[in-house]
Amino acid sequence: MPQVDPELFDRGQFQAELALKASPIAAFKKAIRLAGEVLDKRFSAGSDIRPLIEARAWLVDNILQQAWNQFDWGDQSGIALVAVGGYGRGELHPHSDIDLLILLGAAEHEQYRDAIERFLTLLWDIGLEVGQSVRTVDECAEQARADLTVITNLMESRTIAGPEALRQRMLEVTSTAHMWPSKEFFLAKRAELKARHHKYNDTEYNLEPNVKGSPGGLRDIQTVLWVARRQYGTLNLHALAGEGFLLESENELLASSQDFLWKVRYALHMLAGRAEDRLLFDHQRSIATLLGYSDENPKRAIEQFMQQYYRVVMSISQLCDLIIQHFEEVILADEESGSTQPLNARFRLHDGYIEAAHPNVFKRTPFAMLEIFVLMAQHPEIKGVRADTVRLLREHRHLIDDTFRTDIRNTSLFIELFKCEIGIHRNLRRMNRYGILGRYLPEFGLIVGQMQHDLFHIYTVDAHTLNLIKHLRKLQYTPVSEKFPLASKLMGRLPKPELIYLAGLYHDIGKGRQGDHSEIGAVDAQKFCERHQLPAWDSRLIVWLVQNHLVMSTTAQRKDLSDPQVINDFALHVGDETRLDYLYVLTVADINATNPSLWNSWRASLLRQLYTETKRALRRGLENPLDREEQIRQTQSSALDILVREGTDPDDVEQLWAQLGDDYFLKHTAADVAWHTDAILQQPADGGPLVLIKETTQREFEGGTQIFIYAPDQHDFFAVTVAAMSQLNLNIHDARIITSSSQFTLDTYIVLDNDGGSIGDNPQRVKQIRDGLTEALRNPEDYPTIIQRRVPRQLKHFDFPPQVTILNDAQRPVTILEITAPDRPGLLARLGRIFLEFDLSLQNAKIATLGERVEDVFFITDADNQPLSDPQLCSRLQEAIVQQLQAGQGSDTSQTRVTF
């Protein structure tokens, strides 16, 4: 801490100002405000962070001493002002709590009571954010014995005013000789660390991490130092290196990483104007700019900053894991432990952990840096890697160079890992944490810590990739196989499972580089296959999967799966059933590894439908596609069988069906046609709109809720319907719009409730929806009000220009309107209003919400059911949509395209 800093605080000048004022409050406030401005200017100018936070602690020391001296303490030998916690370490950020202990020598302290109250009142009056306790030495001992937090705070203490002897007495009665011996303290702190990590999902890669509490945050470093203090009496990284628990290079890395997080935390406090340790979206962009990151780089400033953040916390996490394991091996060592068992000439087991047989293992036989992970996969009983061996791995990873990467021993070992029955994900994760994976595959190293600034991808690219491999492994486990029955079945019969793991490893490896990441990744995958001398068929499949890993999900979510041509085109692209099986499994794992909330019954049903229809097309032969007439005949025949069995008159059925048109039978299953037909035939002629709600857990759209509406067609039908659904808090995922020749509309919507789940068997909720829709459609002139809902906080920070594309379908008489835009409450209802204003008819729709963005496709016609052909009309439509999408947002540009 600085000895003196007149620019920050001039003691003589301050005392002179105090003497001139009747009340000291104004002088204290002025001194604190001016000093804060000086420190903030130094920070903004790029000053080193460590002197800044130490200077703030020094400033507060002086302020507290001056405040303490404002009161008559009488016999000062019995009272002391002690800094504890972070302030006790001499570290203060702009709005950190100032933790104080007013330490008393005796239980009888009535003589100090009035002065203590007035002192604390003054601190609050001058604006200091103080956390205080008043305890005797004996009370400190009693509470420290019972509370881990109290003993931890007391270990970090400094005397600010009063006799140092009191603090020394307190340290003596709370020492390891009296309480919390190092072993007990270590176990408690380790449990506390695990619980804290679990609170943050056991990942360093949260979208809005806590720089203090998240894994790899400042609290991890403090935990290491607390344990070291209890065991060795040392409380800084340099001293820890002196004890042999850190190499000097590791000490420097940990210190620089701590400095980086201190900068981020300082900036957070400064920007928020309060104590804030959450790196919220609200602040990420501003901090990136403040710390000097620029959008001129191919990556945006915010993505550069967050990648640096994630790499730093990963480094901290790795080193703290290493030190904690060292402590574990030393502090928890059993006198009778130490049994070893050789695995081979290079490795042995030590109390269940693998360790190098000698310090030169990796230097003499570099291939052992891969072999160790294969051994752990082959021996699942191994608990982990000994700390000294982890350090040896870190020290020798520089030996992994181009020569190493092409050595047949190394390439064979790497492929061998992917052929192991268990442990693939666990050991790839270890390889990543120890820095081996990114050295062996430099292209993987590029994606470590790389975050995409959106709500769709909630993990960094490397974490997502390893999660995908974890999901592939889970597909073989019974609890998961029940959730993903088809994917689990296919995973179990893939001819070479290792190929899907390798494709998964490379599927997103091209991200962060300019260009199509699927194409870039395919090039990298091809080079990998060549270097590892994989057979030609294996190589072709891996490269094809990487290149096409998005095709199935895109087709399922954006194309009309009831169109035989869509199925035939997709089948033609896939080519054979083996590729289809691999692609389906990879797609399911990819979606679940991207963001668990993305996987719902609706997406599951779309993928399953696309898989099933494509498989039928492949087995039938691509040269024999199922034509429209054949599909219609099959649907009608099956539906009629169902209806006749239920006693419905076939003549009535035929009469109704003659009015419905071909599209209806192409867009619905036979079971749904039978369900609709039965209800329509029973509907009274003047019964108003028919609204059917059916839970579809046993049907094509498993888990989604199907709403079927049959009513006289009217100009504003779609607009009224979606506005009413918006009021009912329903999320629309699919819309199938049909108008019969008798001018009745037959609309089917697949919806999920506001929380992403199906409506279920809640009769009250079903009745609420049925009544709400029926009332809205019965009285369309009372157009439902589009509720102005608050935009969620996180969505506000993902404002990007909407993309609106209008083009005519070469195969069908419709115009395709594609919209990509920031997700906002009531967006679909607003689009419905625009369709109404432009006199448009909606034939079909595909709705997809991906994090903070929507990607919707609408198939529209004009009032005469013809494709849009007027360029000026399309331009006005595009302008109206963009204006509506940008209403209340910061975007002022858009990307549009009109094609005929």
From Swiss-Prot:
A biological-process GO annotation: regulation of nitrogen utilization
Record PROSITE patterns: ACT (PS51671), HD (PS51831)
Keywords (A to Z) from UniProt: Hydrolase, Magnesium, Multifunctional enzyme, Nucleotidyltransferase, Repeat, Transferase
Cofactor: Mg(2+)
Residue ranges crossing the lipid bilayer per the database entry: none
Activity regulation info: Uridylyltransferase (UTase) activity is inhibited by glutamine, while glutamine activates uridylyl-removing (UR) activity.
Chain intervals for the UniProt region annotation (Uridylyltransferase): 1-342
Gene3D superfamilies: Beta Polymerase, domain 2, cca-adding enzyme, domain 2, Nucleotidyltransferases domain 2
EC number(s) given by UniProt: 2.7.7.59, 3.1.4.-
Reactions catalysed: [protein-PII]-L-tyrosine + UTP = [protein-PII]-uridylyl-L-tyrosine + diphosphate; [protein-PII]-uridylyl-L-tyrosine + H2O = [protein-PII]-L-tyrosine + UMP + H(+)
Domain HD: 461-583
SUPFAM superfamilies: ACT-like, HD-domain/PDEase-like, Nucleotidyltransferase, Nucleotidyltransferase substrate binding subunit/domain
GO molecular function, one term: [protein-PII] uridylyltransferase activity
SMART domains listed in its UniProt record: HDc (SM00471)
UniProt-listed InterPro entries: ACT-like_dom_sf (IPR045865), ACT_dom (IPR002912), HD/PDEase_dom (IPR003607), HD_domain (IPR006674), NT_sf (IPR043519), PII_UdlTrfase/GS_AdlTrfase (IPR013546), Polymerase_NTP_transf_dom (IPR002934), UTase/UR (IPR010043)
Protein family: Belongs to the GlnD family.
Swiss-Prot/TrEMBL domain comment: Has four distinct domains: an N-terminal nucleotidyltransferase (NT) domain responsible for UTase activity, a central HD domain that encodes UR activity, and two C-terminal ACT domains that seem to have a role in glutamine sensing.
Protein name (record): Bifunctional uridylyltransferase/uridylyl-removing enzyme
The species this protein was found in: Pseudomonas putida (strain ATCC 700007 / DSM 6899 / JCM 31910 / BCRC 17059 / LMG 24140 / F1)
Gene (UniProt): glnD
